[in-house]
A protein has these predicted regions:
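Well-ordered beta-strand positions
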Residues: 270, 293-296, 324
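Conserved Switch II/interswitch segment of TRAFAC-class P-loop GTPases
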Residues: 275-280, 291-309
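Membrane-interface helix-start motif
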Residues: 40-54
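Extracytoplasmic
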Residues: 10, 28-30, 155, 171, ...
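Short boundary/hinge segments that flank catalytic cores
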Residues: 52-176, 181-186, 194-198, 202-209, ...
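Nucleotide-state-sensitive switch-loop elements of NTP-binding domains
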Residues: 215-244
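Phosphate-binding/switch loop-helix module in NTP-utilizing enzymes
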Residues: 241-281, 288
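Non-transmembrane alpha-helical coiled-coil
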Residues: 1-43, 82
Length: 359
């Protein structure tokens, strides 16, 4: 027992000595830590900064939207303005037919006022349905460009075509012919699209004997004139396509077609011809080699530049004279609006004094 007491006393003495050493060491060390300021909790979070984050998000989203729009425009291979048409094809833009955004306006212009019996068979003759509309002014501007396209005399034979189907060439052909007839000229419209004829539906006529009938065998002048119909409302002469033949290109390229055009030129002031798309069929290219000039209809945002370039090359290779391009369903920019500003204030001149004289 005494031995355990002595051992515990030894442990106690060692602990006392160690504590004394620690106290001496602590007193010898300088304490340079002090409280500078008592911490105060902030009124709002330090992070994230909401205003800064929203501002950065708006800037980044705007940059992304602009970049995406530029990228999509870079990928777009179509033409959408008269400037693009002229710069890429190196051809003059004769007119820009505006797109109708309002469905109410579209319905009014396409259907028109009709007659007393509510007949709307001429619904696609936009230049008649609303003579003061921007559409009618566009076609009057086109008429002026056509009449001034050749020095010395106005063209006798004119082909209106397009690169692809459904670009509006038939409606453009009909309205162009009507606008020429409004000057008092004797105008004939010929439906040479014997693959998908439409002129007879535009004028509400039956498509019985027509162009294909005359080209199937040699025809005399009196036979040709007998098949031509007259539309009193538009003061326009119409030759329908006739029955759809199995070989339209062969008929178009025949000697009968050349002879027929000579007969028509001798009897009419202007002959306006509607043909199939030239990038799809050879019919239009064959006709282009026989007429005084060609007008190419291009729907904005539809036909690729490569197809347009090919169409222009096809016409150039045969020596066709391209008067220019009509941009259909165009969104009007500054240059396109200039067309209508100019044509609007000259409309009375062409509808008044010019109508008294046959061109």
């Amino acid at each position: 027992l005494e031995q355990k007491i002595d051992t515990n006393k030894g442990f106690l003495e060692n602990l006392i000595k160690q504590q004394s050493s620690n106290d001496i060491a602590a007193r010898g060390t300088d304490n340079n830590i002090s409280v500078a300021e008592i911490a105060v909790p902030p009124d709002e979070p330090v992070s994230p900064r909401r205003v800064l984050s929203v501002g950065l998000a708006l800037i980044l989203s705007t940059m992304f939207g602009v970049g995406l729009a530029l990228f999509l425009e870079y990928l777009d291979d179509t033409v959408r303005s008269t400037d693009e048409v002229e710069n890429y094809l190196q051809l003059p833009a004769l007119a820009a037919i505006p797109i109708i955004d309002s469905m109410a306006k579209r319905r009014l212009l396409l259907v028109g006022p009709g007659n007393e019996d509510g007949d709307h068979t001429k619904s696609e003759l936009l230049i008649q349905s609303d003579p003061r509309s921007s559409l009618a002014e566009a076609y009057r501007q086109l008429r002026t460009s056509i009449l001034l396209s050749t020095a010395g005399r106005a063209p006798k034979t004119l082909l209106v075509t397009s690169s692809l189907p459904s670009e509006g060439k038939t409606i453009t052909t009909a309205n162009t012919a009507v606008s020429l007839a409004q000057t008092g000229a004797k105008v004939l419209i010929v439906d040479a699209d014997m693959r998908r004829p439409r002129i007879h539906t535009v004028f509400g006529m039956e498509n019985g004997s027509g162009l294909s009938s005359l080209l199937s065998s040699p025809a005399k002048e009196e036979d040709v004139l007998e098949l031509i119909k007259f539309d009193t409302s538009s003061n326009l002469y119409v030759m329908t396509s006739g029955p759809v033949p199995p070989n339209p290109a062969e008929l178009i390229g025949s000697e009968q077609m050349t002879s027929l055009l000579k007969i028509l030129q001798n009897n009419f002031t202007h002959v306006v011809i509607d043909s199939p798309p030239i990038a799809s069929f050879t019919d239009g290219v064959l006709i282009a080699s026989m007429v005084d000039g060609v007008i190419l209809v291009v729907q904005a945002g539809r036909c690729s530049r490569q197809v347009l370039k090919r169409s222009r090359q096809l016409l150039t290779d045969i020596g066709a004279r391209i008067f220019g391009v009509i941009l259909n369903q165009a969104k009007l920019g500054a240059k396109e609006n200039h067309y209508y500003y100019e044509s609007y204030y000259h409309a009375d001149h062409y509808n008044g004094s010019a109508e008294k004289n046959e061109i």
